[in-house]
Structure formats: structure tokens, C-alpha cells
Swiss-Prot record:
One BP term from GO: 'de novo' IMP biosynthetic process
GO cellular component: cytosol
Protein name, entry field: Bifunctional purine biosynthesis protein PurH
Pathway: Purine metabolism; IMP biosynthesis via de novo pathway; 5-formamido-1-(5-phospho-D-ribosyl)imidazole-4-carboxamide from 5-amino-1-(5-phospho-D-ribosyl)imidazole-4-carboxamide (10-formyl THF route): step 1/1; Purine metabolism; IMP biosynthesis via de novo pathway; IMP from 5-formamido-1-(5-phospho-D-ribosyl)imidazole-4-carboxamide: step 1/1
EC number of the protein: 2.1.2.3, 3.5.4.10
Source organism of this protein record: Listeria monocytogenes serotype 4b (strain F2365)
Lineage: Bacteria, Bacillati, Bacillota, Bacilli, Bacillales
Example GO molecular function: IMP cyclohydrolase activity
PANTHER family assigned: BIFUNCTIONAL PURINE BIOSYNTHESIS PROTEIN ATIC, BIFUNCTIONAL PURINE BIOSYNTHESIS PROTEIN PURH
């Protein structure tokens, strides 16, 4: 290895790396700020303009886009015609490229960033050099990640060159990196133009964690996250205590957070297998947790609990009495953390909360991807329609709205029975609506008397209304829209219960 081209925005570790290269007899070529850093540190360096014999121009937009650079990168060392061609133009081969790109992601995440600032942080020369070097990895070593500095130096010291396997691995990393970089730029500009579903979608995610296994032990898995901070998201969670999250932990935590984000008042949400088993609302977080626990004392065992307010010592004392896999909250008081951290296996996570989840959801199918807007429609309760002779009381309406927020997060067919403070029975995932209703009503038992019922979609028959009325339900909320709505309304009138139509369906598959 004789010549290296180094141009980095992240200068961590670059000076000692370059110093070692010089010790190994490698000539360093560099640009702009990187060259200045080397000169300040006393590292011998050749300016890019000395190689290209052309000055930087257009405020630095053009400096490495030159045949003297790309010819030196792309020339095949095993092809005589290539080597003769670059020699005829006095172009020398470049054996190592170390480049990381302008911080586009960090720039667009800054508050108040302008389009001009974003555009100026789109790197052109860097990706071009990386791609040229990576294409010719048979002869050229290319580094885009500071974590690979040591590997390159070790191989150079031991063998005088990098191995083919290392060059191939680094080239693959480069193409992943530049593809992700371009995808982020494309997404940013697409969002500005307002296109919702462009003809091509390229997504970029960063690996956060290799998981022990997936949904089952025989399935390999990893957790990838979107670039940047996504509020209300398990991807942005900070783990304070406990062992690593599992695949199922992550999915359940995501489900719990989505429900907790629906409420502004203190709420506690217990989830098992991506369905809520208990949701409690209170004047404070202790009351909310106790309501969630009382909703289903059996199913909460081994569950995930998400709370939208800080966990205090009193709440922590209650929670420490049973086995919970995960507790997620915006924060934990010092006393609460000390209480819960005594249990070594419990996972304690903090997540920034900021209202209900918005944006788009992505679901993979065999050979494709479904993208839809999140089910975060803002519903105007003033547009809800009371269709029965009996009007819901103020207390019933409060309870209906609370359960309506919850039922949309339950797997369809979904029925939730509850009050304004807690769920009392949850029927999820049955192939017919009456099946889910009977499960929810059975779970609620005697507590169904005076409670309300929420359904994520319309009633195809009047049987659910009749079952609810016989169990003591006093009010029902549902979207409406069935050709048999009239029969359901008549059944509600027969038993003297109120029914509210929202005209918004909340299927969840």
C-alpha cells in the first residue's frame, strides 16, 4: 500500500490512524478541514489540488471530482491497458480511501434547519470516491466507518496489505452506507414535495441490536431503527436496567406505548401478546396502575406495562409485588428506580412521550410492503351521533370515549368493556364479533353492570347488542355502517341502552 486518500467530517481517531499509515510508508492525500487537521498535528500530507493540479471551486463543491482521483481509484491493477492509460496521464494508483460523509442526517434533525442548509450538507464528492473505491475492491481498501480503522492497521502491520476478504466486506459496507445516505436525502426531499406514495420507496434503518432469537427460538432476528429520534417509540427507548430486550418484548412494548400515547391523563397499560389485558386511568399514576392491575390480575403477570407519567415510589412498590417483563415510562423517581432495580430480570425503560403516534406504518407481506397512514385520525366527538332513544349520560360518554381510544389497539374483531377509569373485559381476535363480545362480557362478569362497550367496527347482527344489554351494559360506541344498523339500534332501544356512532372504523389486523 503506497497511497491513501483521506477526507472525513468525523475526525475522531483520524490523526493517530494517519500517523500509523505514515510510519508504514503510506503517502497521505487529503482535502480541506482534514488536511488542516493533519498539518496541525504534524502529519505529512499532500493537498488534493497538488494531485489534480486544479483548485477547489464553487465553495468547495468541486474538489475531488477529477480523473486524477477517480482514475487512480478505478484502474484495474491486473489490466495492462488500465495501468498504461493512467501512466500516460501521470495518474498514480490510490490504494486506500478513508471517507465519511457530510452530516446530512444530523443537519436535518436540527431545529429550524433551512432547505439551503440541508442541500449544502448533501455530499457529492465523498460518495463518488467511496463508490469508485468500493467498485475496485479487488485492489483498493475503502473505509467509511471509524470502527474499521484498527482492522485495517492490524492487517497492514501483519501482512503489508489488507486481505481480499476484508476489502470485500468493507466494500459491501460502503454500498450499504451510500445507499442509506441517498435514501435519507430522497425521503427528505420527497417529504418537502408532499408526495405521500412515490413510485419508488427506499427505506433505511440502522441495526440497533442482534436479538437472541425472533418470535420463536428457531428464528434468527435483529432490531433495526429509523434514523433519528422517534418520540413515543420503542426505537428511542433508553434502557436503565435489566437484560436485553427480546423480539417479543419489543413488539409488546410498541403496542403498549401506542395505547399509552392516546391519553393525556395518567394512564397505565398492561400488554400481553400485543393486546392490552388491562388499561387504567387515574388522578395520579399510582391509581392508574392499580386500575390496570385490577382489570385483569391474572394476565398482567409476565406482561409489559407502559405508563405516560413518571413512576413514583408508591407505584413502584405495587409493581414490585408481581413479575413484569418490562416497565416503560417517561422517567422513574430515584426511589422508584431503587425499588424496581432490586429485581434483576425486570427491564426498565424510559421513552419520550409526545401525544398519539402519527406518521406511516409499514407491514411486510411475502414479496411486498404495505404502507399506510397510522390510525391516528383526530376525531371530533361533536360529530358523534347518538342514534337511540336514550341519551348517554355525561359519565357514560366519558367512559365511551376512553374505551374507544383503547379498542382501536385491540386485534380485530375487537370488543372492550369498561368504565371511564379502566377496562373490565377485552375480547380480541375472534373471527366473529359476537365471539369477541362474549369473551369481553364474560371477563367483566358482574362488573359489566353499568359499564359501557366499545366495538372497533360495526355490528353485522344485533346479537352483540342483545348480549351486552343482558349483561348489564348501559351504553355502546361503535362506527356504524352496517346494512343492519337499524336492527342493532332497535335492539338497543328495546333494552333501554344508548348507542353512539362515530362513523370511524378502527380495524386492526
Amino acid at each position: 500500500m503506497k497511497r491513501a486518500l483521506i477526507s472525513v467530517s468525523d475526525k475522531n481517531g483520524i490523526v493517530p490512524f494517519a500517523e500509523k499509515l505514515v510510519e508504514l510508508g503510506v503517502e497521505i492525500i487529503s482535502t480541506g478541514g482534514t488536511k488542516a487537521a493533519f498539518e496541525q498535528a504534524g502529519v505529512p500530507v499532500t493537498g488534493i489540488e497538488e494531485v489534480t493540479e486544479f483548485p477547489e471551486m464553487l465553495d468547495g463543491r468541486v474538489k475531488t471530482l477529477h480523473p486524477a482521483i477517480h482514475g487512480g481509484l478505478l484502474a484495474r491493477r491486473d489490466t495492462a491497458e488500465h495501468m498504461e492509460a493512467i501512466a500516460a496521464h501521470d495518474i498514480k494508483p490510490i490504494d486506500l480511501v478513508v471517507v465519511n460523509l457530510y452530516p446530512f442526517q444530523e443537519t436535518i434533525q436540527k431545529s429550524g434547519v433551512t432547505l439551503e442548509e440541508a442541500i449544502e450538507n448533501i455530499d457529492i464528492g465523498g460518495p463518488s470516491m467511496l463508490r469508485s473505491a468500493a467498485k475496485n475492491y479487488a485492489a483498493v481498501t475503502v473505509v467509511v466507518d471509524t470502527a474499521d480503522y484498527d482492522t485495517v492497521l492490524t492487517e497492514l502491520e501483519e501482512h503489508g496489505a489488507t486481505t481480499f476478504e476484508t476489502r470485500q466486506r468493507l466494500a459491501a459496507k460502503v454500498f450499504r452506507h451510500t445507499a442509506a445516505y441517498d435514501a435519507l436525502i430522497a425521503e427528505y426531499l420527497t417529504n418537502i414535495t408532499g408526495e405521500t406514495f412515490p413510485e419508488k420507496v427506499t427505506l433505511t434503518y440502522n441495526r440497533k441490536q442482534v436479538l437472541r432469537y425472533g418470535e420463536n427460538p428457531h428464528q434468527d432476528a435483529a432490531f433495526y431503527t429509523e434514523p433519528g429520534t422517534v418520540e413515543n417509540s420503542i426505537s428511542s427507548a433508553k434502557q436503565l436496567h435489566g437484560k436485553e430486550l427480546s423480539y417479543n418484548n419489543i413488539r409488546d412494548a410498541d403496542a403498549a406505548l401506542k395505547i399509552a400515547s392516546e391519553f393525556t391523563e395518567p394512564v397505565a397499560v398492561a400488554v400481553k401478546h400485543m393486546n392490552p389485558c388491562g388499561v387504567g386511568v387515574g388522578e395520579n399514576i399510582e391509581e392508574a396502575y392499580l386500575k390496570a392491575y385490577e382489570a385483569d390480575e391474572t394476565s398482567i403477570f409476565g406482561g409489559i406495562v407502559a405508563l405516560n407519567k413518571e413512576v413514583d415510589a408508591k407505584t413502584a412498590e405495587h409493581m414490585s409485588k408481581i413479575f413484569l417483563e418490562i416497565i416503560i415510562a417517561p422517567s422513574f423517581s430515584e426511589e422508584a428506580f431503587a425499588i424496581l432495580a432490586k429485581k434483576k430480570n425486570i427491564r426498565l425503560l424510559t421513552v419520550p412521550f409526545a401525544g398519539s403516534v402519527k406518521g406511516f406504518e409499514k407491514t411486510s407481506v411475502n414479496g411486498g410492503l404495505l404502507i399506510q397512514a397510522s390510525d391516528s385520525v383526530i376525531e371530533d366527538t361533536a360529530s358523534y351521533e347518538v342514534v337511540t332513544e336514550k341519551q348517554p349520560t355525561e359519565a357514560e360518554m366519558k367512559a365511551l370515549i376512553a374505551q374507544w381510544k383503547i379498542v382501536k389497539h385491540v386485534k380485530s374483531n375487537a370488543i372492550v368493556v369498561g368504565s371511564d377509569k379502566q377496562t373490565l373485559g377485552i375480547g380480541a381476535g375472534q373471527m366473529n364479533r359476537i365471539g369477541s363480545a362474549l369473551i369481553a362480557l364474560k371477563q367483566a362478569g358482574e362488573k359489566a353492570k353499568g359499564a359501557v362497550l366499545a366495538s372497533d367496527a360495526f355490528f353485522p347482527m344485533d346479537d352483540t347488542v342483545e348480549a351486552a344489554a343482558k349483561a348489564g351494559i348501559t351504553a355502546i360506541i361503535q362506527p356504524g355502517g352496517s346494512i343492519k344498523d337499524k336492527e342493532s339500534i332497535e335492539m338497543a332501544n328495546k333494552y333501554g341502552i344508548s348507542m353512539v356512532l362515530t362513523h370511524v372504523r378502527h380495524f386492526k389486523h
